[in-house]
Structure formats: C-alpha cells, structure tokens
Curated annotation (Swiss-Prot):
Function: NAD-binding protein involved in the addition of a carboxymethylaminomethyl (cmnm) group at the wobble position (U34) of certain tRNAs, forming tRNA-cmnm(5)s(2)U34.
Assigned keywords, A-Z: Cytoplasm, FAD, Flavoprotein, NAD, tRNA processing
Domain of life according to the entry: Bacteria
Pfam hit, one: GIDA_C_1st
Intracellular or extracellular location(s): Cytoplasm
Protein name per its UniProtKB record: tRNA uridine 5-carboxymethylaminomethyl modification enzyme MnmG
Complexes and interactors: Homodimer. Heterotetramer of two MnmE and two MnmG subunits.
PROSITE patterns linked: GIDA_1, GIDA_2
Native source organism of the sequence: Streptococcus thermophilus (strain ATCC BAA-491 / LMD-9)
Location (main, coarse): cytoplasm
Gene name, Swiss-Prot/TrEMBL: mnmG
Family: Belongs to the MnmG family.
GO molecular function: flavin adenine dinucleotide binding
Length: 633
C-alpha cells in the first residue's frame, strides 16, 4: 500500500518528553528535516514526577549527554534552584551531580530551544499510527488523519502509552499529570507485531510551602563551590542564591495509618497490575517490605521559585486521597500541611526492549526507533540518554552513514542500552553505578574526554564546544607530560620542605607524577616542588589530572579488561544464523539466543542464562562456518 503524504520529513519524533526533545534536537542539528509531534505542547520536557535532574549514576548520564552535544545539561544549568555534588566522601567513580530544578522554567526554556532550532518543526498533534511498507517505516498518521512521510520514526511516548492513573479505587485513562493517554498508537504498535509489556510508576503528593513548619525539619543546602552539568557553563554564572531542601521522616503513626489502610491500597487490592520500580517503591510498599524500619527519609523539595508547590520525595503513593491527607499530617513539620495535589500511580505500556538493536532501532521494522520509558526505563536522564542515541542513529540512517553504538566502556548510556537490549527488563530499569563494570573510567569528570570526539564525528558537536574541548585536552596532555618528566630528588632541602608539610621524606628520586600518587599529595602540593604550569590551568583540568594520576593503576586494569572485551565485540554473529543448527549448546542458551538474536560474541556472553561453555561452542561453530566459506571462495 502506498500513501499520499500531506508533508514529508526525514525524521519524525513522536512525543516531546525528555527522550523526544533530545532525539529531535539531535537529528535536526545533524541536518535532517525533523517533525516533533506531541499531544500537548505545554507538556514538552515537563517533569511529571521529581523536580530534579541528576543524582547517582544519572548525573554522569547528563554529563555524557552534554559531552555528545545534547541539551539536558545546558538546560538544567540555566534553570536550577539548587546544585549539589553527591558522594564527595567516596571515590571519583561514584561522584555525581544533582540539581533541584525550577520545574516550570526548565520546561519553558527547553520549549524555547526546540522552537528556535533550525530544521525542526514542532506540532501539537496526536500520532495514532506508524505507517509501514515492506517492513520499513514510511511515516505516521495523526488522529486528525494527517499523514506525514519520513524515512525514520522515533517513538518516545513515555507513560502516555495506554496510560491509566490510579488513586485508591479510582482508575481512569490518562497520561502523566492528567494529560491525554495515547491509546490508538498503543494498539497500533501491537498490531505491527511488537511485544508489549505493562509497567507502573508513581508520584507523591505535593504540599503548600507556606503550610510547612520548617522548624521541625532539617535544612539541606546546596553547594557553594561551583559545579555544572554542561562543559560549556562558566563558574562566574554559578547560582549563589540557592533554595534549600528540607529533611523529615515518617514515624510509627505514619506506618500505622498505612498498615490500617492496606486493604484500600491499589497495590495490594489487585487494582494495580503493572510492575513497579524496585529502586523507587511507593511508601506503602516500603512499609510492608521493610517492616523492621521505624522511619523512612522524606525530602521536601521546592518545585520552583514562583510556586508554592513542594514535592514530598519518598512518599510516592496511590492510596485514597483521605488516607494521603491523614498520612501527611502524621509527619513532623507537615502536621498542618495543605495537600495541593494527590499522589498517584500510573500504569502504561512498554515495548519490550529485547526487540531492539543497540542503535535503538527495532529489529522488526527498519527505520522505527523507540526510546525512553517506552523501552521500560525510569527517570528523565535515562530517557534523555536513549533519546539522544535514537535521534543520532535515526539521522545517520537517513544520511546513509555508519551507525553509532555506544559500548559499555564508552558511557553509562552504553551500559544502559546494552542491558536493555541484551537482558531485557522485568521492571522499570534504573541506572546504578553498580551496573557499570568499568565505572572508574566512566566518571563525571571525564565525560567530555570520552564522548566529545564521538559527538564531533557524528556531526553533533559544534565549533564552540569543540574548541573548548581541545583547549582542555591540550592543557591536560601538556601538564601530564610535564609532571611525568619533572623530578624531585631526595636532597636535604627538598626533604625538609616535605617534612615541614607533615609528609614522609623521599628516599629515592621520583617524578612529580609519582609523587602525586601518594594519597596525601595533591596537585597544588606537587607544584610547590616542581613549579607551576606554563599556563593557568582550569580547575577541572587539575581535578582530572589528580584523578587520572592517583587511580592510574586501577584505570589501566580497567582498560586492559576493555581491550579483552573489545576483541569479543569485534566477533560478529551473522544476522541469519540458524540457532537450531548448533549442536550441544544448552536449551536455555538456545532459547535466549533465538529471542535476543545477539549481534556479537560479546553481547551473547552477557545474556543471562548463557554460560561460558555455550559461548565456546558458538565460537567453534562460527569459526567452522568461516573456514567452510573460505574454502568455497
């Protein structure tokens, strides 16, 4: 069947949440003609749940998005009300930035960026159907029967896909924050042959700031020391007038209220059918699962400068409204709090991610990509990271250029995508530092060193960003070389100076770099002995130098592991392989291989239920086939 289109585009993005805006901006900046279609323009880049960006692992993802040329980091740096570096007392691998956002300003600023982007058309429109011919995407059809042609379509519908909001016994069709649900498109994706799952997430009630007794809570201020998500942001623009958050706790009375009303909780009454997030459970789930805990932390997070709404982080719930009010009033500082919005659960459809390639293109339909919560993840940052990769690959496909696959050793975004397409997910997927085996080389401070050259290669990093990156890289390389050459000798004058600083004297000559490997020696101390750099170094360059030098041994071990895995990743598996023709592999492995259809030996080795013996048999089989082909040739 051929279609007559009202308008033609290179790439169409369906849904303008955090995944959709990154996908559409990336494709447009790479030179494609892009349509971004969304149900409600007022929901563009909206934060329906927590009013924050970043956090453990997630903050590193935002830095990665920025390093590649994405928008989230720049946008939050313009609109935050508080900034805080987490895990500063721990090693560099787990440090991550978190910002409290001005929720309305964040969405408004991102909307303006999208509206001003060259090559990008923004349209309020509900897409009801993905149009396909011969297993290839050709466009979309809207609810108003407009047909738009495209060579690639990226679906980023989030929790709107057959969304249903649940509060107590009440259940109704809705996307997040009472927006319209996308039901017809959900039916269409299933009709196209995609396997669909059903997940659930939730959000806490919001209370009025002026009704909170802050004297009964603990203040949580932001950092005075400048930190930014974007590598383009400047320290002189760092916000000093930050708004604090506040800490309080549930108590025994709170827990009794929940336990006495579990029969009315949708999670336990059978109303909620979708699988909820393990790492962000509802308060009723926490009380049941952790019955031995006598209290749980709650953070009171302002939603912006020009609003009275305060987000009660840690109190996600779908309990009936009257129970939510009673629960809030049992909490210290909230005894007289006015509830502005009730918490709710939302169930929604997802595309089971084992059906995707590492580019986020579906295996079933050429040119159809999915990203964000549509793929079963949770969180704005995870969504934005996927949206960026999907948008880049949609543009590359249209342009006939090689695809971009971020490896596990490249980025947390690569870890997430590999987890999704290789292992799938049975619950809303959240990124954690523990998921990354190479986390010491996937740090907050080196995201640009890892990814900006990749962003430049695909055409997403502009000249301004590239020049800033080159200056930093050149400074780092020159100073590392100098520190590797400059020597300290165990002479009397040097040792007296070292001892005066309270450190152990030298017994042998060593380079300044070797001297800095001592835990107590920082860059400033080392330069007291070898002199300063020939140029003023940026503080971020110094931070990077200290980390790379002090952890060099561990970093080199990680790089050795990366090299070994690279050899596995380079061993491709033919797309048309007959898994039934391979003798001796375990039944479970055969079933998993058929379901996931891994593209490389490396990916095959990471599938759960596949053991090393199965991989060895697979490699022998592939080598035998290669030899047979060589003889024929």
């Amino acid at each position: 069947m051929s279609y007559e289109f009202d308008e033609n585009f290179d790439v169409i993005v369906v849904g303008a949440g955090h995944a959709g805006v990154e996908a559409s901006l990336a494709a447009a900046r790479m030179g494609c003609k892009v349509l971004l279609a969304t149900i409600n323009l007022e929901m563009l880049a909206f934060m329906p749940c927590n009013p924050s960006i970043g956090g453990s692992a997630k903050g590193i993802v935002v830095r990665e998005i920025d390093a590649l040329g994405g928008e989230m980091g720049k946008n939050i740096d313009k609109t935050y009300i508080q900034m805080k570096m987490l895990n500063t007392g721990k090693g560099p691998a787990v440090r991550a930035l978190r910002a409290q956002a001005d929720k309305a300003l964040y969405a408004m600023t991102m909307k303006h960026t999208v509206e001003c982007q060259e090559n990008l058309t923004l349209r309020q429109s509900m897409v009801d159907e993905i149009l396909v011919e011969d297993s290839k995407v050709v466009g979309v059809r809207t609810a108003t029967n407009q047909k738009y042609g495209a060579k690639a379509v990226v679906v980023t519908t989030g929790t709107a896909l057959r969304g249903e909001i649940i509060i107590g016994d009440l259940k109704y069709s809705s996307g997040p924050n009472n927006s319209l649900a996308s039901v017809t498109l959900a039916d269409n994706l299933k009709e196209l042959g995609l396997e669909i799952g059903r997940f659930k997430t939730g959000t806490p009630p919001r209370v009025k700031a002026s009704s909170i007794n802050y004297e009964e809570t603990e203040i949580q201020p932001g950092d005075e020391k400048p930190n930014h998500f974007s590598f383009l942001s400047k320290d002189e623009d760092y916000l000093q007038d930050q708004i604090p958050c506040w800490l309080t706790y549930t108590n025994q009375e709170s827990h009794d209220i929940i336990n006495n009303n579990l029969h009315r909780a949708p999670m336990f009454s059978g109303i909620v059918k979708g699988v909820g997030p393990r790492y962000c459970p509802s308060i009723e789930d926490k009380i049941v699962r952790f019955a031995d805990k006598n209290r749980h932390q709650l953070f009171l997070e302002p939603e912006g400068r020009e609003t009275e709404e305060v987000y009660v982080q840690g109190l996600s719930t779908s309990l009936p409204e009257d129970v939510q009010k009673e629960l809030i009033h049992s909490i210290k500082g909230l005894e007289k709090a006015e509830m502005i919005r009730t918490g709710y659960a939302i169930e929604y459809d997802i595309v089971l991610p084992h059906q995707l390639r590492a580019t986020l293109e579906t295996k079933l339909i050429s040119g159809l990509f999915t990203a964000g919560q549509t793929n079963g993840t949770s969180g704005y940052e995870e969504a934005a990271g996927q949206g960026l990769v999907a948008g880049i690959n949609a543009a590359l496909k249209v342009q006939g250029k090689p695809e971009l696959i971020l490896k596990r050793s490249d980025a947390y975004i690569g870890v997430m995508i590999d987890d999704l397409v290789t292992k799938g997910t049975l619950e809303p997927y959240r990124l954690l530092t523990s998921r990354a085996e190479y986390r010491l080389i996937l740090r907050h401070d080196n995201a640009d060193m890892r990814l900006t050259p990749i962003g430049r290669e695909v055409g997403l990093v502009d000249d301004e960003r590239w020049n800033i990156f080159k200056i930093k890289k050149n400074q780092f390389d020159r100073e590392l070389t100098r520190l590797s050459k400059e020597k300290l000798k165990p002479i009397k004058e040097t040792n007296e100076k070292i001892q005066a600083l309270g450190f152990k004297p030298l017994t042998d000559a060593m380079t300044a770099k070797e001297f800095m490997r001592r835990p107590e020696i920082d860059y400033a101390t080392a330069t007291q002995f070898v002199g300063p750099a020939a140029e003023d170094l940026d503080a971020k360059v110094i931070e990077l130098l200290e980390t790379e030098i002090k952890y060099e041994g561990y970093i080199n071990k990680a790089l050795d592991q990366v090299a070994k895995m690279k050899r596995m990743e380079e061993k491709k598996i033919p797309e048309n392989i007959d898994w039934d023709a391979i003798d001796s592999i375990a039944t479970e492995a055969r079933q998993k291989f058929k379901k996931i259809n891994p593209e490389t030996i490396g990916q095959a080795s990471r599938i759960s239920g596949v053991n090393p013996a199965d991989i060895s048999i697979l490699m022998v089989y592939l080598e035998g086939n290669n030899k047979a082909r060589r003889k024929v040739d």
